[in-house]
């Protein structure tokens, strides 16, 4: 088992939830944390513990964004007008790797990050290899012509359910997507309940 898969399994067990909705998640078989003490009954979390778990879960979902980068999203979320929690979700869903994953061009957030890193994506006709690049409403994202027959793309297009959210328009035949608008929390198809306002509270302490 690769270190990446082990890390994903560990986060699922720590949270006691199937963070990415994966069929092979260990919590589908057991609902306790990792390690020799994982089966102990868990007590009620403190406010800090609840906020920390909310942060770990949301940060982990987006392919384990670094703490430095995640804190920058928090700073931008509170700077913007409106609800800071909603702003945080909007920023995360604008990430190029998140859009690639939502469009079902690849099967997982981790694969999406690697796919962008390797230069397989164009935004408005220009190659972009930065997973954290923030797309804007109206931006057109496409898989490079030379990359459309890669196994990772072919397998995803054949096996992935085409439950693309409403804020992304996709043509799977041409492997193009258009980001139409910034979504709200209720529109994002998370497999588990996310609490961005708890994340805001964590960083606001």
Swiss-Prot record:
GO MF annotation terms: rRNA binding; structural constituent of ribosome
Basic residues composition bias: residue spans: 1-12
PROSITE patterns assigned: RIBOSOMAL_S4 (PS00632), S4 (PS50889)
SMART domains reported in the protein's UniProt record: Ribosomal_S4 (SM01390), S4 (SM00363)
Keyword set, alphabetical order: Ribonucleoprotein, Ribosomal protein, RNA-binding, rRNA-binding
Positions of the S4 RNA-binding domain: 94-156
Any Pfam family the entry gives: Ribosomal_S4
PANTHER family referenced in this protein's UniProt entry, alphabetically: 30S 40S RIBOSOMAL PROTEIN, SMALL RIBOSOMAL SUBUNIT PROTEIN US4M
Gene3D superfamilies per the UniProt record, alphabetical: Ribosomal Protein S4 Delta 41, Chain A, domain 1, RNA-binding S4 domain
SUPFAM superfamilies (alphabetical): Alpha-L RNA-binding motif
Family (UniProt): Belongs to the universal ribosomal protein uS4 family.
Region Disordered, residue ranges: 1-49
Keyword Ribonucleoprotein: yes
A GO CC term attached to the entry: small ribosomal subunit
The protein's name in its UniProt record: Small ribosomal subunit protein uS4
Functional note: One of the primary rRNA binding proteins, it binds directly to 16S rRNA where it nucleates assembly of the body of the 30S subunit. With S5 and S12 plays an important role in translational accuracy.
GO BP annotations listed: ribosomal small subunit biogenesis; translation
Oligomeric form and interacting partners: Part of the 30S ribosomal subunit. Contacts protein S5. The interaction surface between S4 and S5 is involved in control of translational fidelity.
Source organism superkingdom: Bacteria
Keyword RNA-binding tagged: yes
């Amino acid at each position: 088992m690769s270190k990446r898969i082990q890390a994903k399994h560990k986060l699922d067990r720590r949270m006691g939830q199937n963070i990415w909705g994966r069929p092979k998640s260990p919590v589908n078989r057991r609902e306790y944390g990792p390690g020799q003490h994982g089966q102990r009954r868990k007590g009620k979390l403190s406010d800090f513990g609840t906020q920390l778990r909310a942060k770990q879960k949301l940060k982990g979902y987006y392919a384990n964004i670094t703490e430095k980068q995640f804190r920058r999203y928090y700073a931008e979320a509170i700077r913007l007008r409106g609800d800071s929690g909603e702003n945080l979700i909007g920023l995360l869903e604008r990430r190029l790797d998140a859009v690639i994953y939502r469009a079902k061009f690849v099967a997982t957030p981790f694969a999406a990050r690697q796919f962008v890193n390797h230069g397989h994506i164009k935004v408005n006709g220009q190659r972009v290899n930065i997973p954290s690049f923030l797309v804007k409403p109206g931006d057109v994202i496409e898989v490079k012509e030379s990359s459309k027959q890669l196994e990772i793309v072919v397998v995803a297009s054949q096996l992935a359910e085409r439950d693309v959210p409403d804020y992304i328009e996709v043509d799977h035949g041409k492997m193009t997507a258009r980001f139409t608008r910034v979504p709200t929390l209720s529109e994002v198809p998370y497999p588990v309940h996310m609490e961005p306002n708890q994340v805001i509270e964590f960083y606001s302490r």
